[in-house]
């Protein structure tokens, strides 16, 4: 492993860790950054699975107290069973649609132009959602009804389009469906666990032949980097949403997306030939 490969692993690990749980699309940033630094091919597909798994493990660690409370309360606490049921219900739409359409989406939509367009459109929707009057019906994730969970689950499927953002779609969906800002954000984190683990297991099995012993050092660097920066991002976001809206993320999405589109339109970067 040379210095440049190690540097690429660090950069992409940082990008994954920082963006996975912010409403700005980690997949979109990975596609764009990987293209800029020339990290692609079969190794990149395997590497992405590893760093996404690291990011979700960071959330598992951050919410380990709540997870243990739910696990040990399944047999005796109705709220633990209700929470688990809501999580599974919200998870199912992504399972069904992911199995049916994942390959088609990866083939035709995993490119910087799609990402940039989705960033802009998603940013505009976020601004619209933030400026609507919020009527909070649910202050805590334990108080959610099954209908809230199912609707958020369907909204999460929009994130199959790269650039949309899984966390962004579920958080904004939660706000629109009556969840408080804290409840929507926390449920988005919890929903990420089965969704991302399921996606990682599915992709890992499907592309198992891509994992080579020679790539272990690269994978290790990316894993550790992604885990650390995901922890930082999750803690920072939980503090941020206590006193701020998501408007700053919306404007970032719009500006970043327009910048990518501008570089393509004026011929500065040939994004149209890039592929994730």
Swiss-Prot record:
Q: Tell me the leader sequence span.
A: none
The residues that cross the membrane are 43-63, 85-105, 109-129, 183-203, 214-234, 249-269
**Compartment annotation:** Cell inner membrane
In terms of InterPro entries, this protein maps to: UppP
How this chain sits in the membrane, per its record, is:
Multi-pass membrane protein
Hydrolase as a keyword of this entry, yes or no, is yes
Q: Name one GO biological process term.
A: peptidoglycan biosynthetic process
Identify the Pfam families for this entry: BacA
Indicate the principal place this protein occupies in or around the cell.
membrane
The job of this chain, per UniProt, is described as: Catalyzes the dephosphorylation of undecaprenyl diphosphate (UPP). Confers resistance to bacitracin.
- Record protein name field: Undecaprenyl-diphosphatase
Gene designation: uppP
